[in-house]
A protein has these predicted regions:
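Membrane-embedded helical hairpins/re-entrant loop segments and their flanking transmembrane helices
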Residues: 15-30, 52-73, 251-322, 438-441
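Short, non-helical or kinked segments that cap or interrupt transmembrane helices
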Residues: 56-61, 78-91, 138-147, 195-200, ...
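Interfacial segments of multi-pass membrane proteins
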Residues: 94-101, 187, 310-325, 331-335
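N-terminal signal-anchor module of multipass membrane proteins
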Residues: 2-81, 89-105
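Juxtamembrane interface elements at the cytosolic ends of transmembrane helices
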Residues: 10-12, 16-17, 44-47, 181-189, ...
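Intrinsically disordered, low-complexity non-transmembrane regions of multi-pass membrane transporters
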Residues: 1-34, 219-238, 272-275, 285, ...
Length: 442
């Protein structure tokens, strides 16, 4: 197979003995479509939730996730099985840059889009460098102790956003708690694909419960489906034009470093599952993700990243065929062109979104700890301990640094602080043995 060409996909059925479908194999059309639906459903929860938290049009974000996934597919030569969805790493910095209050559409989204484009540009440049010299420099710059600390800091930084959106009233607070319980029960007491879709299934159950509590029992503001009934089945989503503000760009662009670390981890996980060496395609994967982020930000969508949810689906199904993600992307694009689907998304109550956010942002924080555990990071070393302690407080407290007219927000200071502190504190002085003492007999 040529390294930079598309593979010759071999037809295979999941009914074969091994049940494993490799990236360069394909299923019959009907099975490919079904698997595509599974992946579209898997990405749905977070890809819808993240733009809502930033005040973006979720319909457009769904559409751009599909287009971005197709772009990623072509740039990687159809060899890397991944789906690109809305990244949670942008939520905190977009809210900080725009002052969004969490309700409705973001009136200042244009300057955030400029920052998202800048982030995608930085990400793309990093990908081009990786294509030339490989990823070892990234792994040295951001070892597991750094990436774990940064990921956990992101989750902690987003915590106030989740709590604020879940506590508009006493009723909303209780419904947020019920949403957390719904998701938790799905996570613990279900199995297989249902368990993998815990956010989506939990959201659906919580919305049904909210509807009973409000529309039937009258305990809160009823869910209004008027917009859904009047919305067209097909139409264009709401596009936005980016504006380039220096401070917003400086605030959002550093997210590229986080996306690199995240994507690197995801691709290593895919390599481990498929038994294929993904290193030759790592740079192109970064470029594909970066260009997809630029394209999404150019029209009003959120920044994107490879999705762990879809990696989880692959782990369950053992189907790694990249053509499945083409099917998932097409399904996402069809949903993105449906205003009725978008109107249905907007009926999700704020309390339910807040409850889901508590779980999602908490899972992000825990993912940082998982990185430490999986890589056996030694937190008994004072260098690691001090770096992690400082970075978690910087991220959780949203510590900002201002230089001239530019401000680096909490996620940015946590990211660069982790890299710099690790480089400084991981240095070891060479132990010089003490001079030998000669004891003379008296």
């Amino acid at each position: 197979m040529a390294m930079f060409g598309f593979p010759h996909w071999q037809l295979k059925s999941t009914s074969t003995e091994s049940g494993v479908v490799a990236p360069d194999e394909q299923l019959p059309f009907a099975q490919t479509a079904v698997m595509g639906v599974q992946h579209a459903v898997a990405m749905f929860g977070a890809t819808v939730l993240m733009p809502i938290l930033m005040g973006l049009d979720p319909n457009l974000s769904i559409l751009m996730s599909g287009i971005g996934t197709l772009l990623f597919f072509f740039i990687t030569g159809g060899r890397v099985p991944s789906y690109l969805g809305s990244s949670a790493a942008f939520v905190g910095v977009v809210i900080a840059a725009t002052g969004f209050n969490g309700q409705g559409m973001n009136p200042n989204i244009s300057i955030a889009l400029g920052g998202i484009i800048a982030c995608g540009l930085v990400y793309t440049v990093i990908g081009l460098v990786v294509m030339k010299i490989g990823t070892r420099w990234i792994e040295r710059l951001m070892p597991p102790v750094v990436t774990g600390a940064v990921v956990m800091a992101i989750g902690l930084n987003l915590a106030p956003i989740a709590v604020k959106s879940a506590s508009a009233s006493a009723f909303d607070s209780w419904m947020a708690v019920m949403t957390v319980l719904c998701i938790g029960l799905v996570a613990v007491f279900t199995r297989g694909m249902i368990q993998r879709l815990l956010i989506l299934v939990g959201l659906i159950v919580a919305c049904l419960l909210y509807g009973v509590m409000t529309n039937v029992l009258g305990l809160g503001k009823a869910v209004d489906f008027t917009l859904v009934s009047h919305a067209a089945w097909f139409g264009l989503p709401h596009f936005s034009t980016p504006a380039f503000n220096g401070q917003a760009m400086m605030l959002i662009a550093p997210v590229a470093v986080i996306l690199v670390a995240e994507n690197l981890g995801h691709l290593k996980a895919v390599a481990g599952m498929t038994g294929r060496n993904m290193d030759p395609y790592m740079g192109r994967a970064f470029v594909g993700d970066g260009l997809a982020t630029i394209l999404s930000g150019s029209v009003g969508g959120s920044g994107v990243t490879t999705y762990a949810e879809n990696i989880g689906v692959m782990a369950v199904t053992k189907v790694y065929a990249t053509l499945v993600f083409v099917a998932a992307a097409v399904i996402a694009m069809l949903l993105g062109f449906s205003p009725k689907f978008g109107a249905l998304i907007h009926t999700i109550p704020a309390a339910v979104i807040g409850g889901a956010s508590i779980v999602v942002f908490g899972l992000i924080a825990v993912a940082g700890a998982r990185i430490w555990v999986q890589n056996r990071v030694d937190l008994s070393q004072n260098g690691n301990l001090i770096m992690v302690a400082v970075i978690l407080v910087l991220g959780a407290g949203d510590f900002a640094l201002t230089l001239g007219g530019f401000t680096l927000g909490g996620i940015g200071t946590a990211t660069f602080g982790a890299i710099l502190l690790n480089a400084l504190l991981s240095r070891r002085l060479v132990d010089v043995p003490p001079p030998e003492v000669v004891h003379q007999e008296p």
